[in-house]
C-alpha cells in the first residue's frame, strides 16, 4: 500500500501542473481492498473495484465536473486490476470530459518497498503467535489478525473465509473525495 501511495503522490505533481487526469491501476484481481486503501490515502476522485460496478456518468464524470467547479484541476482514478481495463476507463473519461487522461499501471512495483513500522510490529506479533502455536503442539493452523487481534485458527477455516470490502471506508471515501 505504501509503495503505491508514494508512486501516486509523485504522479500527482505532474497531474496538477498539467491539469490532467491520471488513471492508476493497482493490484487487486479478485478483491479491491488495496485499491480502496490507496484511493482513500491519496484522495482519489473515484475508485473502481471488482466488487461493484460504477455508474460511470455519476460516479466518475459528475464527480470530476463537481471537482472542477470546486477548483480541483486534476483527478486521480484508482482502478483495481480486477475491475477491468484501466485504459478503457481512461478512454471513457477522455471521451466524456475532453480532459487529457493518462494511464499508469503500477504492476509488480507494488510488491517492493520497505515495510512500515506497523508492518514490522504486525510481523513480530504474527511470528510470535506462530511459534507459540507450534510450541503448544498445534498443527494445521494459520495465524490471522482480526480487528488487530492476532490468533491462530484451523487452516481449513482460514481458507474458507473471505474478507468483505469495508463499506464504511468506501462510503467515507465517496463522501470526502470531491
Positions of predicted regions on the chain:
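Gly/Ser/Thr-rich helix-start
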Residues: 29, 33, 108, 114, ...
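Acidic, glycine-rich active-site loops and adjacent beta-strand->loop/helix elements
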Residues: 28, 53, 108-110, 148-149
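Short active-site-adjacent structural elements
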Residues: 86-88, 111-114, 149-154
Amino acid at each position: 500500500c505504501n509503495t503505491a501511495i508514494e508512486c501516486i503522490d509523485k504522479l500527482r505533481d505532474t497531474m496538477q501542473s498539467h491539469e490532467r487526469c491520471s488513471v492508476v491501476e493497482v493490484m487487486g484481481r479478485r478483491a479491491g481492498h488495496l485499491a480502496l486503501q490507496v484511493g482513500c490515502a491519496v484522495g482519489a476522485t473515484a475508485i473502481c473495484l471488482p466488487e461493484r460496478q460504477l455508474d460511470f456518468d455519476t460516479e466518475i464524470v459528475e464527480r470530476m465536473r463537481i471537482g472542477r467547479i470546486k477548483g480541483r484541476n486534476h483527478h486521480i482514478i484508482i482502478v483495481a486490476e480486477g475491475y477491468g481495463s484501466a485504459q478503457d476507463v481512461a478512454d471513457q473519461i477522455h471521451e466524456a470530459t475532453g480532459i487529457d487522461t493518462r494511464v499508469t499501471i503500477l504492476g509488480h512495483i507494488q510488491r517492493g518497498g520497505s515495510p512500515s513500522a506497523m508492518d514490522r510490529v504486525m510481523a513480530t506479533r504474527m511470528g510470535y503467535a506462530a511459534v507459540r502455536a507450534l510450541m503448544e503442539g498445534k498443527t494445521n493452523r494459520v495465524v490471522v489478525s482480526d480487528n488487530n487481534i492476532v490468533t491462530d485458527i484451523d487452516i481449513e477455516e482460514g481458507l474458507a473465509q473471505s474478507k468483505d470490502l469495508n463499506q464504511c471506508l468506501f462510503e467515507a471515501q465517496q463522501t470526502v473525495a470531491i
